[in-house]
């Protein structure tokens, strides 16, 4: 998931069968503050202080990150003991590739950002294990941090991938020990603790996405893939595309009775644009 996708995920508007959502506008950026100037020129320019090159982060370090920190490109938080409460753990530390065709590129260039947005999700998959579907149904996610431009200019070339889990829509869950976290989704019943659940029927009043270890009344039981290219097929098309499969799946989970409930959550246009080609099938429970 790209950092832009993560920002959007923190403000997702659900559009489910029989339900409509209200768009949430993004906050306007704060205006920049102009630097103060002096009418009298300085006789001598003060020597610039070179940026201190920080040591590379340590793999398996733990942090108490907050939600606003997740969308920042850099992070200078002090590690905490992994035996204490923490909301992030570094699962990989790598080296930035800042040379393209013999030319140096900036740490915030598209080339470097592509490296981070492909490397860290693959490292997350390897770390937590499980199938692609299990990971899509889980509340686990990954964020990445790199040096600041000044630190990069001074020689810092590392990046780190941090594993996180969402407890609610915009609240991080405390993470378990490293022993329990590594390979977590490869264990039986993992989604009962780390899966995607809801506090009400999806799209209904009072609905909030929560981690399944919290109180809930609905849960996502599967993802349903959708065919299509780059262009969004349209709401009516994606609504119909997975509804039948979700209905059949929910009925089978209900013992093939004629009376059952389900919710088909199809991807929005924005989610489709970010590469999501599946929706969620929900049932009470």
Regions found by a protein language model. Give the residues of each.
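C-terminal motif of bacterial Sec signal peptides marking the signal peptidase cleavage site
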Residues: 15-18
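Bacterial N-terminal signal peptides that target proteins for export
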Residues: 1-9
């Amino acid at each position: 998931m790209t950092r832009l996708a993560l920002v959007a995920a923190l403000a997702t508007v659900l559009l489910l069968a029989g339900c409509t959502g209200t768009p949430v506008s993004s906050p306007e950026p704060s205006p920049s503050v102009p630097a103060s100037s002096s009418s009298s020129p300085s006789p001598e320019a003060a020597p610039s202080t070179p940026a201190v090159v920080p040591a590379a982060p340590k793999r398996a370090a733990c942090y108490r990150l907050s939600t606003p920190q997740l969308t920042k490109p850099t992070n200078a938080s002090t590690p905490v003991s992994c035996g204490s409460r923490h909301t992030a753990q570094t699962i990989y530390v790598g080296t930035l590739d800042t040379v393209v065709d013999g030319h140096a590129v900036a740490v915030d260039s598209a080339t470097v950002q592509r490296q981070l947005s492909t490397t860290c999700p693959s490292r997350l998959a390897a770390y937590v294990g499980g199938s692609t579907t299990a990971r899509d149904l889980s509340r686990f996610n990954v964020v990445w941090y790199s040096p600041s431009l000044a630190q990069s200019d001074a020689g810092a070339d590392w990046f780190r991938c941090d594993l996180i889990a969402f407890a609610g829509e915009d609240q991080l869950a405390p993470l378990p020990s490293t022993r329990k976290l590594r390979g977590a989704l490869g264990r039986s019943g993992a989604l009962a603790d780390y899966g995607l659940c809801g506090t009400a029927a999806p799209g209904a009043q009072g609905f909030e996405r929560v981690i399944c270890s919290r109180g809930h009344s609905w849960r996502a039981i599967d993802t349903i893939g959708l065919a299509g290219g780059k262009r969004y097929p349209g709401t009516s098309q994606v609504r119909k595309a997975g509804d039948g499969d979700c209905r059949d799946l929910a009925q089978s989970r209900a013992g093939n009775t004629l009376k059952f409930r389900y919710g088909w959550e199809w991807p929005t246009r924005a989610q489709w644009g970010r590469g999501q080609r599946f929706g969620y099938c929900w049932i009470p429970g």
